[in-house]
Amino acid sequence: VLPLGFMMDEDVIDAWDYSDLDEIEAQNRLAELLGADEPMLTEIPSESVVGESTIDVQEDAYIFATYESTTVDSMTEEISDGRTKSFTKVSHGYTLDLGYCTAGTQVRIKNSNEERVNITAYALNLDAADTAYQTLNEQTMEMTSFSDTKITGTIDVKKEGRLIFAVADDAGWKLYVDGEQTDPEV
């Protein structure tokens, strides 16, 4: 997991145009810009019928899935090893984290409305993810204190770029750099 704050190269930010990409293509493009030699998420076979989708996992991997727009509000994952997981508010559209599965595992995703929801499944390439992570982890903020109203930390910037924070853009937060209040870009 990346720290709360990390530096990102401006060239990467400028080159990462994801406006015409879906969420998986955008992540793969970012991983490539961060040095990955292969896609971070690779499509794997899946089949969708009314009421459920099935993924037959061929290789050990973390599995994710996207789906077409739907009015279905909840889905349930059932894995052949007995694990289950519920997803709510899926009508909002997000990537489903189906967890780590070994080769030979069958994943079924059932929906509450007995509708056909077309699923596209992906396997995570750990080498590509690690390469991207290591690039982002080169310059990170060390948090020195935090509370529900204040976060304090330091970062020694060795290469110019943009400081990225994993903090929600909620009213009331102020950003200070070297003691000077600065307007954040969101």
Cite the ranges covered by each PLM segment:
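Active-site-proximal, structured, solvent-exposed surfaces of multi-pass membrane proteins
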Residues: V1-V186
